[in-house]
């Protein structure tokens, strides 16, 4: 049986990575000549657009509806390592936006500032969802898990 992915480990450790990558992209755009006001504006615009796009969808509410129906599992079920889970959470979104930011830097540093803002927005949205996930788990005394990939089935184990 394939090891499960702990959702808390999937969503939380990638947050500082995304934020740092976003700030590095902003600093690089500034170093390549984007004015302070334009770079901050573009960075904020990218973060705001991503945040609004993600926080106004029904995905979060449907996730927690599915979480309420999570299949109970015991401690014997294998769980993927934290390092592997971190790598999984970076692909493809964090890696793709980081690569696009790096590609845009020498071509259009203003676009890179916008993309860096999207990375920061990913961190902000992830922290909102991460907070909701931790609160949900703590109120129920469980940890949520999923199969690797795009599996929709969720599993719950009593918190230790």
Task: Show which residues each predicted segment covers.
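N-terminal first transmembrane alpha-helix
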Residues: 1-63
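Select subsegments of transmembrane alpha-helices in polytopic membrane proteins
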Residues: 10-20, 82-96
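Short membrane-interface loop/juxtamembrane segments of multi-pass integral membrane proteins
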Residues: 67-90
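Alpha-helical transmembrane segments and their immediate juxtamembrane interface regions
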Residues: 115-151
């Amino acid at each position: 049986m394939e090891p499960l992915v702990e959702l808390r480990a999937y969503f939380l450790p990638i947050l500082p990575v995304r934020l740092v990558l976003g700030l590095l992209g902003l600093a690089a755009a500034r170093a390549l000549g984007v004015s302070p006001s334009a770079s901050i504006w573009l960075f904020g615009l990218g973060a705001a657009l991503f945040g609004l796009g993600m926080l106004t969808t029904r995905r979060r509410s449907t996730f927690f509806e599915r979480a309420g129906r999570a299949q109970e599992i015991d401690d014997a079920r294998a769980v993927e390592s934290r390092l592997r889970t971190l790598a999984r959470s970076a692909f493809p979104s964090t890696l793709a936006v980081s690569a696009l930011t790096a590609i845009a830097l020498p071509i259009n540093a203003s676009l890179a500032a916008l993309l860096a803002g999207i990375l920061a927005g990913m961190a902000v949205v992830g922290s909102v969802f991460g907070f909701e996930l931790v609160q949900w788990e703590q109120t129920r005394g469980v940890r949520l898990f999923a199969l690797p990939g795009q599996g929709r089935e969720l599993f719950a184990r009593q918190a230790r």
